[in-house]
A protein has these predicted regions:
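Short loop/turn motifs that connect adjacent beta-strands in outer-membrane beta-barrel proteins
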Residues: 1-12, 24-25, 54, 58-62, ...
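Residues that define the transmembrane beta-barrel architecture of outer-membrane proteins
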Residues: 8, 42-48, 96-101, 178-182, ...
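Transmembrane beta-barrel strands of outer-membrane/channel proteins
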Residues: 16-20, 64-68, 136-140, 197-201, ...
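Residue-level signature of outer-membrane beta-barrel architecture
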Residues: 18, 54-56, 66, 107-109, ...
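Surface-exposed coil loops of outer-membrane beta-barrel proteins
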Residues: 78-95, 99-102, 112-220, 224, ...
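Outer-membrane beta-barrel "beta-signal"
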Residues: 101-114, 339, 408-420
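Signature for the C-terminal beta-barrel architecture of outer-membrane proteins
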Residues: 163-286, 291-296, 300-307, 314, ...
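Outer membrane beta-barrel transmembrane domains
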Residues: 226, 242-276, 297, 308-387, ...
Length: 420
């Protein structure tokens, strides 16, 4: 809505994102405590963010964001591994007050004299950066700000909305229920490749708002290698390889199944003494320009599947493929459109846990006739005036919550985004 200053020490901007979603009645043989409701629903979520930043010197900046999130989610965000709205508050009991989203120091160490142009944003105020450099960040941030980024499949403001489109569903990245953590990132960048590492805090409980400030016990490590090279002649492309390990007070599905069978009860993944277990996984993130205005992308993710889904969503394996288009193709240069197919899966121990009536922090139908959760999503974002964008879309989900006895469900979507 308002112009941003170029070559300025300061940054001041904001955004508001409203997402309206609904679904009609859909078939379901049964429902449980953490099911997507089979009855007609509608819900509207909102996220409002105020971005600030100041460049302290030629290599250091301070970035602070305030945020407010509210509204509602379909079935309070339960019943889907690939939830239809990444903006929802996953704990409806959280305060609706303004909270601190990001607060970090960003330091750049030049390792070469030549410079490259940098597109200023709320994550970096520099208008140019050394071509070869080391970037350090310390403070509060969201790991997807810097890892698993994709130019056509990462932004709920302008692109897709599904959790497992915008992020790798099998990446159980360290975060509180609002998506933020506290930690340190180190990012080495060279001409056509980069490598980054993050050490971050984990929550006390699955989907919890409180982080554990004992990094010698409870912690997460994230690694990503990025190669900026296309597979098509004279067409840009990027491949990113991700790996992570989490150490936290997480339950083990098989242990809880055995314990429940011995006791003649329903398994409960939270019913265990405090202990540290480890979860690990990896991902591949690929994008390739097909033309100047059309980009194909894909993600694959995998985790060990034996340890409790804890911080992001209940996915042990995922595959997504789609395309994103820039409106310059049809002479609407600020419009965007996209289409994607996602298939999410869970491992056998996780399947058995849900089939025996167990519930996770998102899923729990009281039983399970297992099938992959398959999702189709498409959208069209229209630039209407200045910083105002409107976007109709739709998602179709087969086997919601991995259950063949429920669904399919169709979720029409309408998004209104304002930047100022």
């Amino acid at each position: 809505m308002l112009p941003h200053f170029k070559n300025s020490r300061f940054w001041l901007s904001g955004q508001t994102n409203f997402v309206f979603q609904t679904h009609p009645d859909f078939p379901a043989l049964y429902s449980g405590p953490h099911s997507l409701s089979p009855d007609y629903e509608k819900a509207t979520s909102r996220v409002m963010t105020f971005y600030t930043g100041v460049r302290l010197n030629n290599s250091t900046e301070l970035l602070v964001d305030l945020e407010e999130a509210g509204g509602a989610a379909l079935s309070t965000g339960l019943g889907l591994a690939g939830n239809t709205d990444l903006d929802i508050v996953r704990n409806p009991l959280l305060s609706k007050n303004v909270y601190l989203g990001r607060a970090m120091i960003h330091k750049v160490f030049a390792l070469s004299k030549d410079k490259i142009e940098n597109q200023r944003s709320f994550l970096s105020l520099f208008d140019e950066l050394p071509r070869r450099r080391l970037e350090l960040r310390f403070g509060k941030f969201s790991l997807p700000d810097f890892f698993d980024v994709n130019s056509v499949g990462s932004d709920t403001h302008f692109q897709f909305l599904n959790w497992t489109t915008d992020n790798n569903g099998a990446w159980d990245y360290a975060a509180d229920t609002r998506g933020y953590t506290v930690g340190l990132t180190a990012d080495f960048e060279d001409r056509n490749w980069g490598f980054r590492f993050a050490e971050a805090l984990m929550p006390e409980v699955a989907n919890g708002i409180n982080l554990v400030y004992r990094p010698w016990q409870v912690h997460a490590e994230n690694y990503e290698y990025e190669l900026r090279r296309g597979i098509l002649p004279k067409k840009a492309g990027v491949v990113r390889l991700l790996a992570y390990t989490n150490s936290a007070n997480m339950g083990i599905y098989r242990d809880q199944i055995i314990e429940a069978e011995d006791a003649g009860t329903t398994p409960d993944i939270t019913n265990h003494p405090w202990h540290i277990t480890r979860k690990y996984g990896f991902g591949v993130n690929f994008e390739q320009n097909l033309t100047h205005n059309l980009t194909a992308f894909a993600r694959f993710g995998w985790d060990n599947g034996k340890t409790e889904s804890f911080a992001y969503t209940e996915v042990d394996q995922t595959f997504a493929e789609g395309v994103g288009a820039n409106g310059a193709w049809w002479h609407r240069k600020q419009d965007r459109a996209g289409i994607v197919f996602i298939s999410n899966a869970i491992k056998k121990d996780h399947q058995n846990y849900l089939a025996d009536g167990g519930i996770g922090f998102l899923l729990g139908d009281g039983g399970l006739n297992y099938g992959c959760e398959n999702i189709f999503e498409t959208y069209y974002t229209v630039h209407t005036w200045r910083g105002i964008y409107l976007a109709p879309g739709v998602q179709h989900i087969n086997n919601p919550g991995y259950n063949r006895d429920r669904g399919p469900v169709v979720v029409p979507t309408f998004r209104a985004h304002i930047e100022f």
